[in-house]
Amino acid sequence: MAVPFRRTSKAKKRKRRTHVKLQLPGMNECSNCGEYRLSHHVCPECGQYDGKDVANS
């Protein structure tokens, strides 16, 4: 099995891993109360989705 001839430096390793990161969830402002909520989810603060009261009915 092949073995690296030279050790990979910290800089080289970190430059390679710049694209390895966590993705932030897609957040939107609620059109009713202005709080941030996940896309395509009911607002946890006011219970509305797509302009309709869903959670409190």
Curated annotation (Swiss-Prot):
The keyword Ribonucleoprotein applies. One of its GO terms (molecular function) is structural constituent of ribosome. One of its GO terms (cellular component) is cytosolic large ribosomal subunit. This is Large ribosomal subunit protein bL32B. It comes from Listeria monocytogenes serovar 1/2a (strain ATCC BAA-679 / EGD-e). Belongs to the bacterial ribosomal protein bL32 family. It comes from the Bacteria. Keywords: Ribonucleoprotein, Ribosomal protein. The lineage of its organism: Bacteria, Bacillati, Bacillota, Bacilli, Bacillales. GO terms for biological process: translation. Pfam families: Ribosomal_L32p.
